[in-house]
Amino acid sequence: MVPWAVKKFAFDPDKFVHELVDSIIGDHYPVPDRMLVHNEQIVHEYLQWAMCGDPRPKGTFKIYAVEGGTAAMCYTFKSLKSNRILNPGDTIALGVPIFTPYLEMAHLEDYDLHFVEIHAKQENQFQYPAEEIKKLLDPKIKAFFIVNPGNPFAVALSAETIKLIGDVLKKRPDLILLTDDVYGTFVPGFRSLMGEFPRNTLGVYSYSKYFGCTGWRLGTIAIHEDNIFDEIIDKHPDKIKKLLDKRYGTLTLEPRKLAFIDRIVADSRDVALNHTAGLSLPQQVMMTMFSLYELMDTKKAYQKACLGICKKRFAAAVEGLDIKLGPNEYFDYYYGLLDFEFFARKYVGEDIVKWMKKNVHPLDIVFRLAQEYGIVLLNGGGFAAPDWSVRISFANLENHVYDDIGRAARAIARGYRERYEADLAKNGNGAKKKVPRSKR
């Protein structure tokens, strides 16, 4: 691993080995605080592969090594507010369904943001249609936050959807993009917004999902050297600039030249403790090793193995559900969103959907799965997904469990259908509207 890295990055062997050995001991604070010199170069190359796809963007991303995607979210929100890029009362757009904390953080008193929902449509294979993307043309929307591939629906942006966003940026070059791409490595050839629109994008990544290392707390914040964040700060009125001068004046004699990425570092330790900022040194060594392992695997055997596991479990769940699904090249197989309303409408009809909404509480599904089958799933409503949906994770359980999940979900759906038919019969409509056996 060490000889490969020395050759690949033209490292001085002694300096690289010293960084590894000195850091694994963990006897002092990170220097530089944002990220170790060799680690940043290695992680930069890893992110180019994992996030940017082809063609790679020109120039360099500056990276801040952080304690997982969670810390990346917290630090980013805090610095956007501290630097008056997003202010209380401002409006952002959220690509929904989305990881629940993005919905919750916007409402916190700390930020007090309004948000517009940009909906990925299930009937459009969870891509954002043109009419939804056009909402971003509204000048009051300052930023678009997105998880790509999605959580809970597990679909990456298609080339067509990325183009739609690009069309918006041509008219709104001031629009901030924040993309959380934790699941990108589960889609071969994945293309992040930070690869397509580096100037407008702040990229968040975590190693936790792909390497199964949640407990290590390894994540990154990446901002291109040519970015609109620094430009927005530079255009602040003099009154705000003076306030920011005071905030960051203890760090440098020229605080107005301090890049946004370095302000994030300082803000992560409330500025006053900036000298203690940064991801712990042993964690950074682990980040180096994970990144090098993937870069050295030119045949992508590890990626294929990970995808193979998830695909096998997905297939078992689908078999248990006894449904047929078409292929989707942008599906990452990490999660699956099972929407009872969508499938009831597709296989039975609109009448049973109306009956469900009148007679079944959306949480009934997850409670019955837990009480009757010992299966614990998250309800989709918490992600701003359809109310009668549940999220299945294909990364956590033994293979044999997934066909059980499929059969249990199907049994609950069958129970709803039987209750629906019983109500029809009770009202004298059973013979007329009984569900055909082929649709059961």
Model-derived features: where do they sit?
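N-terminal basic, amphipathic alpha-helical segments
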Residues: 1-20, 280-281, 426-433, 437-439
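Active-site PLP attachment segment
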Residues: 2, 194-259, 391
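Short, flexible/disordered intra-domain loops and linkers
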Residues: 2-8, 23-31, 121-127, 153-159, ...
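Conserved core of the PLP fold type I
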Residues: 12-15, 23-174, 184-198, 202, ...
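PLP-dependent enzyme catalytic core of the Aspartate aminotransferase-like
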Residues: 34-37, 41, 49-57, 134, ...
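Walker B catalytic acidic pair
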Residues: 180-181
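Extended, charge-rich helix/loop segments that form flexible
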Residues: 241-297
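Conserved glycine-rich beta-strand-loop-beta hairpin in the small C-terminal domain of fold type I
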Residues: 282-293, 300-318, 325-354, 383
